């Protein structure tokens, strides 16, 4: 909702929920999510080999595999999914920020990126499915 509302002023929250459910119904999305969550869980349990354990536990900025896994989701909806994801990864609104800054033994190195990817893909799906409803910022200036 947060990503697409400025471009689709009449957007309803229920449309966003439907779009998220559609994204979550895809096998590729399932595979990315279960892989990322499993890696986060194994990291919490200290079961990865070094140096991977340290890298994932610290969410090292140059690791990037967490973003690569997220790209497998956003790429389902083309360049708009990709740019939406970049925006969400940068500003980290709402739950994405909470997941990214979680402490106390929890590892969300992959989860925050996967949640952002699902949101970005759902926003991209809305834009692709309703191109006539999308308000273009350049056209309005």
List each model region and its residues.
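Short, hydrophobic/amphipathic alpha-helical patches that form generic packing surfaces
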Residues: 3-4, 35, 69-82, 117-121
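N-terminal interaction modules that seed assembly of large macromolecular complexes
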Residues: 1-40
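Short, structured interface segments that constitute the first stable element of a domain
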Residues: 34-52
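Short amphipathic alpha-helical patches
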Residues: 22, 43-47, 100, 138
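Phosphoinositide system proteins, centered on phosphoinositide phosphatases
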Residues: 48-85, 90, 94-98, 104
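Glycine-rich, aromatic-bearing surface loops/beta-hairpins
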Residues: 81-141
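Alpha-helix boundary/N-cap detector
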Residues: 11, 15, 24, 64, ...
């Amino acid at each position: 909702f947060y990503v697409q509302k400025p471009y689709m002023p009449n957007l309803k929250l229920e449309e966003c929920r439907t779009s998220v459910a559609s994204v979550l119904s895809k096998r590729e999305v399932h595979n990315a999510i279960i892989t990322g969550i499993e890696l986060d869980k194994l990291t919490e349990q200290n079961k990865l080999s070094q140096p991977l354990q340290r890298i994932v536990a610290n969410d090292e900025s140059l690791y990037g595999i967490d973003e690569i896994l997220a790209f497998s989701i956003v790429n389902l909806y083309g360049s708009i999914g990709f740019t939406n994801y970049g925006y969400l990864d940068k500003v980290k609104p709402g739950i994405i920020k909470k997941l990214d800054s979680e402490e106390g033994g929890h590892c969300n190195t992959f989860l925050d990126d996967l949640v952002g990817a699902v949101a970005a893909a759902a926003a991209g799906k809305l834009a692709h499915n309703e191109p006539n409803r999308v308000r273009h910022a350049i056209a309005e200036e």
